[in-house]
């Protein structure tokens, strides 16, 4: 999930216009009953609302009708990342980007008709239950996901702390299983690192790009440099992305002067985020996998295209779109795909992903981290050549 960080835009003018139109229709008692002909879209909407309210044999209110209408509008885009955020959804999104939220700690996306786990965040109930990147979510608490959108699935997975949710999963080999996971408060410390033993190589893992990532990454870099770091392994495996600006900031500390990513909007407007760095700080290796997505792919793509470092692992997820969150009121919002992004070489990775410089598989039965080993071997050779 890539949240384009910008101020929430409150569309009071649109809200006032709709409310005023409804008030006029109510005051004049216009039912539009039996009227035929071609109506403008706003009139069609108001006529439908009037018909439903007047004739539906059941309990409902105007709030329910507007809620349903908004959902219908965003679902009509056919884009799984463009969604209506009700009060619960909006609060959950805010909590996640701030670093604390409730649930089981998995991030998923949509590919074709399938809802695929992008990552199970480390040390969360989802990871502890054995949920892995690439697992397909087929049902939540017995309800088939084919009948739900992404936000509805997320809502069913979230819930009160210490309650249980049951997920039906299918792995990459087509084997099915069910897991019961106890919901917990999910805290996502974004950045962690240390020096590797026996060499001058530092290691930094970024789990997710949230509001604290850029500052935490700089602190970790400074700490490791004081400890004698001469080369760096950046671990972005299982990183589902997050805030665009955070990814740009991290890339800007690693790649040389020039483009990091280009963001192209609907009207053709193009914003190029640039690095001002004179040179890369040290030899760099980046670990990626199928769970590396979104903002993590921005960093990976910039490093690969500028040859600031070398990528090790397997092909990344392939999410190359940018979402903006726009406030409807102070409790609800819409998340809309507002742009696509392109790596410094002008490539869109949407539904394609990034292929590492060196493909290194990591079998489940591996006795050690083959991808990490390949990165260490590469950096040790780089240091010997200095």
Sequence positions of predicted segments:
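Short, structured beta-strand/loop micro-motifs enriched in basic residues and often containing a Trp
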Residues: 114-121, 147
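Conserved P-loop NTPase
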Residues: 323-327, 333-365
């Amino acid at each position: 999930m890539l949240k384009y960080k910008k101020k929430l835009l409150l569309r009071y003018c649109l809200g006032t216009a709709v409310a005023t139109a409804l008030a006029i229709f109510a005051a004049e008692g216009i039912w539009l009953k039996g009227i035929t002909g071609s109506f403008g879209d706003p009139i069609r909407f108001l006529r439908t609302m009037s018909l439903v309210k007047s004739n539906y044999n059941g309990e409902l209110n105007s709030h329910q009708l507007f809620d349903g209408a908004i959902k219908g509008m965003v679902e009509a885009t056919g884009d799984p990342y463009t969604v209506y955020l009700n009060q619960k959804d909006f609060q959950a999104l805010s909590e996640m980007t701030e670093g604390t939220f409730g649930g089981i700690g998995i991030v998923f996306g949509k590919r074709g008709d399938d809802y695929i786990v992008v990552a199970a965040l480390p040390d969360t109930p989802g990871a502890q239950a054995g949920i892995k990147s690439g697992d397909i979510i087929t049902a939540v608490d017995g309800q088939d996901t084919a009948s739900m959108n992404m936000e509805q699935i997320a809502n069913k997975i979230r819930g009160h702390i210490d309650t249980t949710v049951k997920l039906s999963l299918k792995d990459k080999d087509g084997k099915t299983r069910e897991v019961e996971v106890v919901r917990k408060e999910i805290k996502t410390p974004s950045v962690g690192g240390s020096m590797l033993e026996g060499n001058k190589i530092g290691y930094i893992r970024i789990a997710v790009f949230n509001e604290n990532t850029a500052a935490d990454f700089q602190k970790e870099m400074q700490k490791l440099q004081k400890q004698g770091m001469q080369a760096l392994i950046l671990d972005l495996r299982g990183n589902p992305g997050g805030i665009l600006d955070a990814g740009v900031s991290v890339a800007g500390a690693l790649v040389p002067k020039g483009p990091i990513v280009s963001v192209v909007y609907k009207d053709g407007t193009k914003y190029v985020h640039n690095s001002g760095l004179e040179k890369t700080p040290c030899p760099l290796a980046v670990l990626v996998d199928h769970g590396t997505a979104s903002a993590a792919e921005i960093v990976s793509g910039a490093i690969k295209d500028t040859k600031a470092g070398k990528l090790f692992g397997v092909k990344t997820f392939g999410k190359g779109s940018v979402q903006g969150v726009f406030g409807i009121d102070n409790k609800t919002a819409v998340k809309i795909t507002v742009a696509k992004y392109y790596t410094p070489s002008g490539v869109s990775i949407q539904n394609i992903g990034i292929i590492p410089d060196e493909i290194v598989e990591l079998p489940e039965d591996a006795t050690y981290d083959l991808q990490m080993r390949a990165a260490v071997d590469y950096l040790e050779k780089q240091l010997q050549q200095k």
